[in-house]
Regions:
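A subset of signal/propeptide-processing and intrinsically disordered low-complexity segments
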Residues: 4-5, 34-36
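N-terminal secretory signal peptides that target proteins for export/translocation
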Residues: 1-13
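N-terminal pro-sequences and low-complexity stem/linker regions of secreted or lumenal proteins
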Residues: 36-708
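Compositionally biased, low-structure terminal segments
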Residues: 12, 29-30, 69, 251
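C-terminal segment of classical bacterial N-terminal signal peptides
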Residues: 24-35
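Sec-dependent signal peptide hydrophobic core
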Residues: 12-23
């Protein structure tokens, strides 16, 4: 990648671009269209509330406690977080109830069966394993973003004063070494003196070695890993925590198996703690880090929470990572491996595919004999064959890829322990797994390219075999189309992706930059959307179209919005302040159009928790989830100012809000939007008594009276 150098010419060019952007912004926020479309034919059905426009903005990979650990609500409101629980103090140090979040190790070396809640050799960590470095060492050298011109030409989705943060925040560390920016982490043995629980990433005592603007490492966030990290067993259940999930194995799972094993043997020099010459999962205790709002972290997020409404009981809908959670946001359900007509098929299992192999796309989280939790087959898929990365004996080009499970069959690896646990609950929870269906639990590319052509059958050498066939399952898009309710999916850098289907320009700097997230756009998986030229072209758009539609006051009823990889807030590859800048640009634009603002609700969330620790209650809804809590803020003139909802909810609650507001049917007979709204008992608003149940988010609003 060619890097730009600072020079007088670069400076003048940057000034020109900045001036042009300022002029564009003045035009953008100047006199706008005087009215947004009301509840007329443009939006089909009339709405039950003054909300005529829903905008759903989805960032990446942060739990509620990770961001809101020390948040303090306004008088009369309460919040459940690390501070309120006494787990940490206001300064981020361990609090009087720190033991609630302490982490344990286990030793299951004699087991060859997936352990959902291991008890063998379970022991409190004396200190946490050292969290390891993640993210660019130097932003200019590693990301190629060296000047404001580089930033502005590569990404158009930030409020102007946030572009500076695309140039900053490098870790200054090289490789997967102890992250010495964190207080309590050392560059020599002993590498960690961190207590065995949550720790503050940022610090304000002495040298500010980890400012909020820094890149941070990313923990493991896969399906079976998260189930294990939650440590769920009915024997742990209490009235306040009837699921019996202790969330005390986050560290142990990430240092014993991590992610992307892909069927490889455990290295002979493997270690669960960092040491020179040893091989680790590359994470350490990364999952336990959090930010401190009381010391100025996440300032725009705090501002929105203070001014509008949020939930402290909103969850990622499944255990695991981005693709699976995003799929639930659109389908309210998991999708399975099928043929073009929707008939369930078996994924490749220890066999060659067009790209080589053998691959094994069926998940097997059973530990390899003689190891302590090193799994048999689990990963996004491996690639080999270069001089620096030769293939193992008997392998050609690709291998691994365990990400599908037939969760209807208790004999399949990993399935039995979860089914047994779900059946033990009161009431027992149904799996919602259909016989012979292999569900996708982790990230695979969708089955279509942006032009609607088939990505699953494409054999171009730049393509990946770790792609799920297109699905005929129904999504919220079908429901909206059937009811003449307008919608668009706005995806940052979609236009660049259309001319770069294999994303060879991913990470490129400048106008060709293509950091579109294909696994984040649920409609991208769906046959009836992607293969219909009229529907696809009308409804799948770039965020440049979003800004234009806001300016014209011509926003659809429902908008799904996804930032690019530059600014989505994903740990290691992005930063939370960049996601804040992305959200701010949209919020400011909508508020600048008074009529549009008066009829809009903006839901700001993340796709999932990214594997970070969270202390909140997790309600089992089916085999797939729920997972940890994640942030949700509702920005609207109708939002209850400073209110914090405790009603149990997840991504499908957004679908329930849309369906209730526009009086729509549910997606299918098995989709999670059929679940009832929760009922609770006094004194425990977080736990539904009619489980499984999720809310519809209406309690975040006050529609009778509002003012700005």
């Amino acid at each position: 990648m060619k890097l730009r150098k600072n020079s007088a010419g670069d400076f003048l060019q940057t000034v020109r671009v900045m001036l042009a952007l300022v002029a564009l912004t003045q035009s953008f926020f100047g006199p706008l269209a005087q009215s947004a479309h009301a509840d007329d034919d443009h939006h089909g059905k009339r709405t039950r509330t003054p909300i005529k426009h829903v905008i759903v903005i989805v960032g990446e990979n942060r739990t509620f406690d990770h961001i809101f650990a020390t948040y303090k609500p306004k008088a009369g409101e309460s919040v459940n977080n690390l501070l309120s629980e006494g787990i940490v103090n206001e300064d981020g140090a361990p609090g009087p109830n720190y033991s609630k979040a302490q982490q344990y190790s286990a030793d299951i070396t004699g087991s060859t069966t997936y352990e959902l809640s291991p008890t063998s050799g379970k022991a409190l960590y004396p200190v946490l394993p050292a969290p390891l470095n993640g993210g660019p060492t130097n932003v200019c050298t590693d990301n190629g973003i060296c000047t404001l011109h580089d930033a502005i030409s590569s990404e158009n989705g930030l409020a102007l004063n946030y572009y500076q943060y695309m140039l900053t925040g490098g870790t200054g560390l090289t490789g997967k070494v102890p992250d010495t920016r964190i207080s309590g982490v050392n560059g020599s043995s002993p590498y960690s003196s961190l207590m065995p629980g949550p720790f503050q990433l940022t610090n304000s005592k002495g040298a500010d070695t980890f400012p909020y603007d820094s890149y941070a490492a990313s923990p493991v966030h896969r399906f079976y890993q998260m189930w294990q990290q939650e440590d769920c067993d009915i024997s742990h259940a209490t009235a306040e925590n009837p699921s019996g999930c202790l969330a005390d194995l986050f560290t142990w799972t990430e240092v014993t198996v991590g992610s992307n094993v892909n069927g490889a043997a455990q290295p002979p020099n493997f270690s669960t703690d960092y040491a020179p010459g040893k091989k680790t999962t590359g994470e350490g205790a990364t999952a336990m880090g959090f930010y401190n709002m009381l010391q100025g972290d996440a300032p725009y997020t705090k501002q929105l929470a203070d001014r509008y409404a949020m939930s402290d009981n909103y969850h990622q809908p499944v255990m695991g990572g981005t693709g699976f959670d995003e799929i639930f946001l659109y389908f309210g359900d998991a999708i399975w491996f099928s043929d073009e007509n929707g008939n369930a098929l078996t994924p490749p299992h220890n066999q060659n595919v067009w790209a080589g192999g053998p691959v094994d796309e069926i998940e097997d989280p059973n530990p390899v004999a003689g190891t302590n939790n090193w799994w048999t087959q689990d990963g996004y898929g491996g690639f080999c064959g270069s001089i620096t990365n030769p293939c193992p004996t008997g392998v050609s080009n690709v291998y691994g890829g365990g990400s599908y499970t037939d969760c209807s069959d208790s004999s399949h690896p990993g399935v039995g322990p979860i089914l047994t646990y779900l059946a033990s609950l009161n009431p027992p929870i149904k799996s919602n797994c259909e016989q012979g269906h292999y569900y996708l639990f982790n990230n695979y590319n969708p089955g279509y390219f942006g032009d609607g052509s088939d990505a699953f059958t494409d054999t171009n050498s730049n393509n990946t075999p770790f792609t799920i066939p297109g699905t005929t399952q129904r999504s919220i898009g079908d429901v909206l189309l059937e009811n003449n309710v307008s919608w668009k999916s706005y995806n940052d850098q979609w236009n660049a992706y259309l001319t770069d289907p294999y994303q060879l320009n991913y990470g490129a700097v400048g106008p060709t930059s293509d950091q579109y997230c294909n696994i984040c756009n649920g409609f991208h998986y769906q046959k009836q959307i992607m293969t219909n030229d009229g529907i696809r072209k009308a409804h799948l758009k770039d965020t440049t179209d979003l800004y234009a539609d806001i300016k014209k006051g011509d926003l659809p009823a429902v908008s799904f919005v996804k930032p690019s990889g530059w600014v989505d807030g994903h740990p290691a590859s992005s930063k939370w302040n960049l996601y804040e800048g992305f959200v701010k640009k949209i919020v400011d634009a909508v508020k600048a159009n008074e009529d549009l603002w008066e009829s809009t609700a903006i839901f700001v969330t993340t796709d999932e928790g990214g594997g970070y620790y969270d202390s909140g209650y997790v309600q089992p809804l089916d085999f797939f989830g729920d997972g940890t809590r994640i942030p949700l803020i509702v920005v609207s003139p109708y939002a209850k100012k400073g209110h914090i909802s405790h009603t149990y909810a997840d991504h499908v609650s957004i679908l329930k809000f849309i369906e209730r507001n526009w009086d729509l049917n549910t997606i299918s007979g098995r989709s999670r939007d059929n679940l009832p709204n929760p009922t609770t008992v006094q004194g425990n608003p977080y736990v539904p008594t009619n489980s499984p149940a999720i809310g519809d988010l209406f309690d975040l609003f006050q529609f009778k009276e509002h003012d700005e």
